[in-house]
Design a protein with these regions (language model features):
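Residues immediately within or flanking Cys/His clusters that coordinate Zn2+
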Residues: 7-10
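Active-site pocket-lining segments that scaffold enzyme catalytic pockets across diverse folds
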Residues: 14-23
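Active-site cofactor/substrate anionic-group-binding motifs, chiefly glycine-
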Residues: 22, 31, 38-39, 43-76, ...
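Short amphipathic alpha-helices and their capping/turn segments at secondary-structure boundaries
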Residues: 23-30, 185-189
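Glycine-rich ThDP/TPP pyrophosphate-binding loop and its adjacent helix/strand module
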Residues: 77, 91-108, 112, 116-239
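Active-site metal-binding loops of divalent metal-dependent hydrolases
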Residues: 85-88
C-alpha cells in the first residue's frame, strides 16, 4: 500500500514512520482497492505520492468534511481516512473535526501533532507548548497571550458521538508498535460501522524545532508526552 519511493520529508521527520504504519495496517487488513484517503494542506499534502490508493486533496482544514461526503457516498465497505497535522486539524480545521465527531461520522482521522507549523516555516501552532519557541513567538509561547496548548483527544473524547480516541507516539520501537495497534483498531471499528475514530500521533519536527533527529526524539519524550499523555481517551467498545 505504501509506494516505495523517497519521501520528501525532512531528515528525522516522523511522517515516514506514520505513513508506513498506516500502509501496513491496510495491507494486513486486506483492504486493497477498498481505501480512500484525504490529505489537506500541510507537510503531508503530497501523501497521494506515497499511498497506493485513491487519495483526495482537501482545502486547508476541510478533510473531515470531504471525508464525510466520500464515506456517505461509497458506504460501509470502503475505509475512509484523513491524515492531518496539528496546524490543519487543531486550527483552521477545528469546526470540521468537531462537527464530524459530533455527527458520529464513520471515518478515521490520523492526527499528527508535532506542536508547530511545519510546512510554513515554524510558526506557533495551537499545540505549541508553553515556553516553546517558534518564529511567531521567539521568546516562547506565553499562556497570557496565547492561552494553553489545545488537547484534541481530551476535547473529542467528551463528544457523545465519538467512538474511539487514542493518543500514541512514534519515538521508540515500543511506542511505534502501540501506534500501529491503535491505528488497526480504529480502522477495524470503522469497517464494523461503529462511528468516529481518531488516533493522535505525537511526532517530531527537527527542522523547525532547531534540533537534531535524536535531540528531537528526546525533546518529545521529555516535553510533549508529559503535557499530552499517551493512552486511550475513549473506547465505547470496551464498555
Amino acid at each position: 500500500m505504501c509506494i516505495r519511493d523517497r519521501f520528501h520529508y525532512c531528515p528525522g521527520c516522523n511522517h515516514g514512520i506514520i505513513h508506513r504504519l498506516v500502509a501496513e495496517v491496510i495491507d494486513e487488513m486486506k483492504l486493497d482497492g477498498k481505501v480512500i484517503g484525504v490529505a489537506p494542506v500541510g507537510c503531508s499534502v503530497f501523501a497521494y505520492d506515497y499511498f497506493n490508493c485513491d487519495m483526495y486533496e482537501a482545502a486547508h482544514g476541510r478533510a473531515p468534511a470531504v471525508a464525510t461526503g466520500i464515506k456517505r457516498s461509497v458506504g460501509k465497505d470502503t475505509l475512509v481516512f484523513t491524515y492531518q497535522g496539528d496546524g490543519d486539524l487543531a486550527s483552521i480545521g477545528t469546526a470540521e473535526i468537531v462537527h464530524a465527531a459530533h455527527r458520529g461520522e464513520k471515518i478515521t482521522t490520523i492526527f499528527v501533532n508535532n506542536a508547530i507549523y511545519g510546512m510554513t516555516g515554524g510558526q506557533m501552532a495551537p499545540t505549541t507548548l508553553i515556553g516553546q519557541k517558534a518564529t511567531t513567538c521567539p521568546a516562547g509561547r506565553s499562556e497570557e497571550w496565547s492561552g494553553l496548548p489545545i488537547k484534541m483527544c481530551e476535547m473529542l473524547a467528551a463528544v457523545p458521538s465519538s467512538y474511539y480516541i487514542e493518543r500514541v507516539a512514534v519515538n521508540n520501537t515500543a511506542n511505534i508498535a502501540k501506534a500501529k495497534k491503535a491505528i488497526a483498531k480504529a480502522f477495524r471499528l470503522q469497517m464494523e460501522g461503529k462511528g468516529f475514530t481518531m488516533i493522535e500521533v505525537l511526532s517530531t519536527c527537527p527542522t523547525n524545532w532547531g534540533l537534531s533527529p535524536v535531540e528531537a526524539m528526546n525533546w518529545l519524550e521529555q516535553n510533549m508526552i508529559p503535557y499530552y499523555p499517551l493512552g486511550v481517551y475513549k473506547d465505547k467498545e470496551a464498555k
